């Protein structure tokens, strides 16, 4: 199974059309990767599908950076 960061990175690159080099743990979805609120909702849905988990709206609001997403997923696997 691929590393969580690799899988999250692939989803971000595919969904947002950014270069893989831009996807760092510190990168903010909105500020650094140019995601709008709809992009973030779609990203959360794809992460839920990819990792077979449910992310509540309250938790999703706390996921601001790539690192937040990776840490959230790792803590629930």
Swiss-Prot record:
Keywords, comma-separated and alphabetical: Cytoplasm, Fatty acid biosynthesis, Fatty acid metabolism, Lipid biosynthesis, Lipid metabolism, Phosphopantetheine, Phosphoprotein
Keyword Cytoplasm annotated: yes
BP GO terms, sorted: lipid A biosynthetic process
Keyword Membrane belongs to the record: no
Signal peptide (from-to): none
One example GO MF annotation: acyl binding
Annotated protein name in UniProt: Acyl carrier protein
Species in which this protein is naturally found: Geobacillus kaustophilus (strain HTA426)
Lineage start: Bacteria, Bacillati, Bacillota, Bacilli, Bacillales
Gene: acpP
